[in-house]
UniProtKB/Swiss-Prot annotation:
Residue ranges, annotated region (Disordered): 261-551, 640-826
Main location: nucleus
InterPro entries the UniProt entry points to: ARM-type_fold, Pds5
Family annotation (PANTHER family): ANDROGEN INDUCED INHIBITOR OF PROLIFERATION AS3 / PDS5-RELATED, SISTER CHROMATID COHESION PROTEIN PDS5 HOMOLOG D
Protein name in UniProt: Sister chromatid cohesion protein PDS5 homolog D
Extent of motif Nuclear localization signal 1: 281-288
Source organism of this protein record: Arabidopsis thaliana
Length: 826
């Protein structure tokens, strides 16, 4: 009951304090006293407060951002207001309590409050020290990156170097160090001004002038060495300055070769610490100060005695975990930090034990914070409170920046794909964070099983491909093959579904070929990747690593062939044509159906060869289980031409499909023949009209004659078209009759055969039926080829007849024109 009463009393006291702040007293001393009372009440509020406590905080939250308090003329009042506001930010973390504009104003006042650290005798010094420690623990400074307050960040760095003194406690030094390291680690691009302030502080001429700022800058540079190395080298080259002008830390950073640490591997703590300090004699360990802090600043869930005993190990672990995050900046993308407000704000890292003495030490809001963020933004490893986790072990120097893979984004840098074992992650927060890593990169485990750690990337066309993903047309990979290699009807069903699901603006493929899967893998490892690569500003896509097969014969033989290229990120095939092959690079140039092109090493890709050139319409008609019987087609033709063609053959399940496909092929040949005849006739008529216009004079009478001739030509063309259509129909009927006669010869007495087949089916084995089906298919293909040859011959005959008819018509027209001219002249 005492806890409940205390909770109610705290809520009531907060409401009264907020109400009083809404109408602040005119006296500065009374206002400072009221702000101190409000701050002490806010310190007793934990993060996971119930709804009643949230309601009790509303008056204070609104009163603290009033114009009267934020713009108060007394600087001590403003510092007290900032101290209360930092508590509000801590309570609501990781969510911001105010709008962006108000948060910018709060950060401006916070940096102004840091100026009070310059005078330890001032009234607001303790408040400024408390604000600094609170910002470092909660990491609310990272919200300034989200709000793009780069000027405020630069001013804060300069103030830290300006106001740090030797008489400051270790808490001030360590808090400044934590804030600066967090800012550098989480920014996507280190600004030139920020780097200049660091380098200017570690100049040798400033070592004796301001030794504390020198030491602070050295600490920050050594802790962020991997992140700052490319920027430092570029700055020194552009200015032409020598390394002798700066601290030995700068030269050590430029000459060092960084290795990729692995979280689950132990390391010697002494050697690791020596590498980070880079031989510097001044070793100010952060853990010594953290172990001496009051109980309110300790991490929840860890015994206070254990923290004092294991302070050094904990600080080194934090240091190594932050290096895991900072080492991935070799492939960093330049630009602004992605806007993820408050996602890096730490929850409260200390326990408020005096509110109710029965609080569970393991209760924290970190799990809730991770669930809220989801996949939108996972905080980096450097922000996880360090516990008894094994320290990282460095790899061999041959490790390159390409080994830093993964799409886990905070500042859009690539993380190491090392496996975070559950045994090595003792704290629940680290375990949850490792599970988020595994969810983000499910393909890394498959790549490790295959044993190929090299990642195939395409930086040339990667950005264009990612932008055109929605425009590319998917290719259906549904293939159902029986024992004889014949495709079944399920393929056509998959095509229909694909056409139904395709959007209206997507180009539906007009040709669906028989595909032959060719799965390949990279045959060699990337052995010369020890050098660090330049940061790239465009994304890359990885190819799925497949099992290794023989790659011989995939050179110039594939030029001109149609293939399907697998895109693992899109999880689909994209159709294209192999345009050329480079023997020197052993690369094929593939032109996709949407016009895009790229060079690929097909031995390292997953792709399919499209062998068959038949159209999608023909495949659909052939694969349909319900085909039109031959008798129905013959009857339709008999009605049209009034010819008696006796057809007594009823197709069985297999012969019916073959006969219907033959008839459909015949129809398609006839359609193509009609189109070609019409094109040739139109072309010849146009040529004849041009000749007539060239021969005639440019007189009005001759123009009238040409118009009359054109009208006559049109009537004659219509008559000629009717004659040609009759001839074509006759030729088609002849072909069908010849076909039916051949079938009658091959299958006489179809009824007897059907009965015989029923009896033979009981005796003959199944393998014989499959052989017969294969023989029938071969005969069918030969018949189709023969029919196509006949169609070509008929086409040539029709062309000859048309040519002779056109010549005779032209001669007649010329004679008639000459006679008309003679009559007119006479």
């Amino acid at each position: 009951m005492t806890a409940i009463v205390g909770f109610d009393q705290l809520s009531k006291a907060l409401i009264d304090a907020g109400t009083n702040l809404l109408s602040p007293p005119s006296s500065t001393d009374d206002l400072l006293t009221l702000l101190d009372e409000t701050e002490s009440l806010l310190k007793n509020v934990e993060q996971d407060q119930p709804l009643s406590m949230q309601s009790a905080l509303i008056p204070s939250r609104n009163a603290l951002v009033s114009v009267d308090l934020l713009s108060h003329p007394d600087s001590d009042v403003r510092v007290s207001v900032v101290s209360c506001l930092t508590e509000i930010v801590r309570i609501t973390a990781p969510e911001t309590p105010y709008s962006d504009d108000l948060m910018k104003e709060i950060f401006r006042l916070t940096i102004e409050a840091f100026e009070k650290l310059a005078d330890a005798s001032s009234r607001s010094y303790k408040k400024a020290e408390f604000v600094l420690d609170n910002v470092a623990k909660v990491k609310s400074c990272l919200v300034m990156l989200d709000l793009e307050c780069y000027d405020l960040i630069l001013q804060m760095f300069r103030n830290f170097f300006k106001f740090i003194r030797s008489d400051h406690p270790q808490l001030v030094f360590s808090s400044m160090e934590l804030i600066m390291i967090a800012i550098i680690d989480e920014t996507e691009q280190v600004s030139t001004d920020l780097l200049d302030s660091l380098l200017a502080t570690v100049k040798k001429e400033n070592q004796n002038v301001s030794p504390m700022s020198w030491s602070l800058a050295e600490k920050v540079l050594s802790r962020c060495a991997r992140k700052l190395k490319p920027y430092i080298i570029e700055a020194l080259k552009s200015r032409g300055t020598s390394l002798d002008m700066y601290s030995p830390v700068v030269s050590s950073i430029c000459q060092s070769v960084f290795n990729t640490p692995k979280v689950h591997s132990p390391v010697n703590t002494k050697e690791h610490e020596e590498k980070l300090d880079l031989g510097h004699s001044r070793k100010e360990n952060l853990s010594k100060s953290s172990s001496k802090r009051p109980a309110r600043h300790e991490t929840r869930g860890i015994n206070e005695k254990e923290k004092v005993r294991n302070g050094n190990k904990s600080s080194l672990l934090k240091q190594s975990l932050k290096q895991v995050r900072s080492e991935s900046t070799d492939a960093e993308i330049t630009g602004k930090r992605g806007r993820k407000p408050n996602s890096l704000m730490n929850p409260e890292d200390y326990d408020i034990s005096w509110l109710s003495g029965k609080r569970d030490p393991l209760k924290t809001s970190s799990n809730k914070k991770i669930q809220k963020k989801g996949s939108g933004g996972v905080s980096s490893l450097g922000k996880v409170p360090a516990k008894k986790t094994p320290l990282p072990k460095e790899n061999s120097p041959a490790t390159s920046s390409r080994s830093l893979t993964g799409s886990l984004k905070r500042s859009r840098v690539k993380m190491d794909e090392s496996d975070y074992d559950s045994d090595s992650l003792s704290s629940p927060r680290l375990k949850k964070l490792a599970s988020c890593f595994r969810d983000e990169e499910p393909n890394q485990e498959d790549d490790r099983k295959i044993g190929n750690s090299s990642k195939q990337t395409r930086s040339k066309n990667g950005l264009e491909k990612s932008q055109k993903t929605a425009k590319k047309k998917p290719v259906v990979e549904a293939k159902i093959v029986n024992s004889s290699g014949k495709r079944l009807s399920a393929r056509s069903v998959a095509k229909r579904r694909n056409l139904e699901r395709a959007p209206l603006d997507t180009l539906v493929p007009q040709s669906s070929k028989r595909k032959k899967m060719v799965s390949q893998v990279a045959a060699r490892q990337l052995a010369n990747e020890s050098e660090e690569e330049t940061p790239k500003s465009h994304p890359t896509r990885r190819r799925t690593v497949r099992k290794e097969v023989e790659s011989d014969g995939f050179g110039e033989d594939l030029v001109g062939k149609r293939v399907n290229i697998w895109w693992p990120l899109d999880k689909t095939f994209y159709e294209g044509v192999i345009d050329s092959y480079c023997t020197r690079k052993k690369m094929h140039r593939v032109i996709y159906s949407d016009g895009d092109s790229e060079e690929l090493n097909l031995t390292e890709e997953r792709w399919e060869l499209l062998e068959d050139d038949t159209s999608a319409d023909e495949d659909k008609e052939i694969d349909l289980p319900e085909s039109i019987p031959l008798s129905d087609i013959m009857q339709r033709q008999k009605v049209k031409k009034s010819k008696n063609v006796a057809v007594s053959v009823e197709p069985t399940s297999s012969s019916g499909v073959r006969s219907s496909s033959r008839t459909l092929m015949k129809k398609d040949c006839g359609k193509r023949l009609n189109k070609q005849v019409e094109k040739t006739r139109e072309g010849k008529n146009l040529r004849s009209l041009k000749e007539l216009n060239a021969e005639t004079d440019r007189t009005a009478e001759e123009q009238e004659v040409s118009l009359e001739a054109e009208s006559d030509d049109r009537s004659e063309e219509q008559e000629y078209e009717d004659d040609c259509s009759d001839k074509k129909e006759q030729s088609q009927d002849k072909g069908v009759e010849a076909e039916t006669k051949e079938e009658e010869k091959q299958y006489p007495n179809s009824e007897g055969e059907s009965e015989g087949e029923d009896s033979e089916s009981e005796e003959e084995p199944k393998w014989r039926e499959t052989d017969d089906m294969e023989d029938d298919e071969e005969e069918e293909e030969e018949e189709i080829d023969h029919m196509e040859d006949e169609a070509e011959e008929e086409k040539e005959e029709v062309d000859d007849k048309e040519a002779s008819a056109n010549m005779s018509e032209i001669e007649k027209e010329e004679e008639e024109e000459e006679e008309d001219e003679e009559k007119r002249k006479s």
